[in-house]
Design a protein with these regions (language model features):
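Cofactor-pocket helix-loop regions in the catalytic cores of large enzyme subunits
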Residues: 1-158, 184-235
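Eukaryote-specific, cytoplasm-facing alpha-helical/coiled-coil scaffolding segments in long proteins
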Residues: 131, 162-165
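Surface-exposed loop and adjacent secondary-structure segments within mature catalytic domains
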Residues: 158, 165-174
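Loop-to-helix "switch" segment enriched in basic
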Residues: 178-183
Length: 235
């Protein structure tokens, strides 16, 4: 889904960086991993709780970062410590020792980064999974500085960059609504050209407009709309 990011990760692995992959499937990236945690689909929360448990139990959290930059850590510890790691391992179908080693590797590295795609977010426990990923980064101090962080990857190639730069029908660069007169004035003064005063068509609306002969052309860059969008026959 993200070949450029994947290539960058592979390059770092070839330079000796350790790679942890949580994936039910043995992908090309998983084959390069030092720790491939082949969890059952839908058990991300269980495995992440295991990792948090091992980090806390081995006192590998960043005490200074936790004290200065987080809240509610005492309650967090109580919640993590009450987890039954053996039961979590059984539910996820993973090797407890492998998860422990991966957790220690993540916590003890000078810098640790995390990347996840729609396989994490577009599932029943997606929100909880992302929260636990953020918890991992925070308790180890792997956020807010160069070479660390949580990196969510969006669904299509460069959709994040396109949105950041204002390639959206309803927002300009910086995510300001184009229908707002204050934002229109800002954009017009910034770019020296008159800015649109109303939102354009979103993708599903474009299809309807094309059918109604209101849309004369569509410039498609880097996306297969027939495969990507719902109802291929309609598209």
């Amino acid at each position: 889904a993200h070949p450029v990011t994947g290539a960058k990760i592979k390059q770092q692995v070839m330079k000796g960086k350790k790679l942890i992959v949580l994936d039910p499937v043995t992908t090309e990236l998983a084959r390069l991993a030092d720790y491939h945690i082949k969890l059952r689909p839908g058990t991300n929360v269980a495995v992440l709780n295991m990792m948090l448990h091992f980090i806390i139990k081995n006192k590998l959290h960043n005490a200074d970062f936790v004290r200065d930059r987080t809240e509610g850590f005492d309650n967090f510890i109580k919640e993590i410590e009450r987890q039954d790691v053996d039961e979590l391992a059984r539910v996820a179908g993973v090797d407890k020792q492998l998860v422990k080693e991966a957790a220690i590797a993540y916590a003890t590295a000078k810098n640790s980064m995390e990347f996840h795609g729609l396989g994490v977010t577009e599932q029943e426990q997606g929100s909880k999974t992302v929260m636990l990923i953020a918890d991992l980064a925070m308790i180890t101090g792997n956020i807010g500085r160069k070479g660390v962080g949580v990196n969510p990857l969006r669904g299509q190639n460069n959709v994040q960059g396109a949105a950041d730069m204002g390639c959206q029908p309803h927002q300009g660069a910086g995510y300001f609504e184009v229908a707002d007169e204050k934002n229109q004035k800002f954009y017009t003064e910034k770019y020296g050209v008159t800015h649109p005063t109303k939102a354009g068509l979103k993708i599903p609306q474009m299809f309807e407009a094309a059918i109604n002969k209101e849309l004369k052309g569509l410039w498609i860059i880097g996306e297969d709309i027939v495969q990507t969008d719902p109802n291929s026959a309609h598209v």
